[in-house]
């Protein structure tokens, strides 16, 4: 072999340039992608206080409240927590647990793990109000009253009294795109915690002794902790619930009738979700038997529960 032939051998081709980096939305794994509601909440904080945020919400809708009625607002502030995955029920319970007396520190991870250990959930979902009640009693140590048959009729007075007494209620409902109640047959089943109530009563029903006016809305009266109330339910013309859920830091004000209708029609799991290959825990009778027409009233004084 000649030296000339060796010198004529071509050099190896250069290595190809590295591929461009993936866009951030593709570089993240599916499990770490942020949902829109998580991105919206990032870097923000909730408005704290029993009445601060509620007053703002009511003020933004002031024209929709008849000044011919006496308006009373009751609320016991619960903190906000943004859910990660289908944890709406456990997050709602975590919020409500902040009203326990005496106070008790409760980690969301404890709720999730206890629910899994008891076979109530696989992914954090809670499709059984009965299981949710047992979980709350077990972990929170409080008494839980589970109502069935819907939020209207005889149950209305029970629910109103509970909220007037500044006690939380866990409500399953169908969640619309703006987190408000809607009617989707259970395909958007979600949990919220109601910690307050706004009542519009007939003129002359209320002694304002324990109901000072709101600073910015003098027609709105705020219940003090020692307020004692007892009116016939027929004197109540309008009812709104003040609620939070795990996809927003903010309180929302919902018409009681709207929540009741949404709660009543929870019939089935979203077929697309049911067939996506993910394991979920469904009670016998499915969503309809597990959630429809049911709410949980948490009695937060755990000392009374022990007695």
Swiss-Prot record:
Name of this chain's protein: Actin maturation protease
Lineage: Eukaryota, Metazoa, Chordata, Craniata, Vertebrata
Keyword Protease found: yes
Localization per Swiss-Prot or TrEMBL: Cytoplasm
Disulfide topology: none
Encoding gene (name): actmap
Residue ranges of the region described as Peptidase C39-like: 80-200
Residues the record marks as active site: 88
Segments of this protein annotated with the region Disordered: 1-34
A single GO BP: protein processing
Pfam families the UniProt entry points to: ACTMAP-like_C
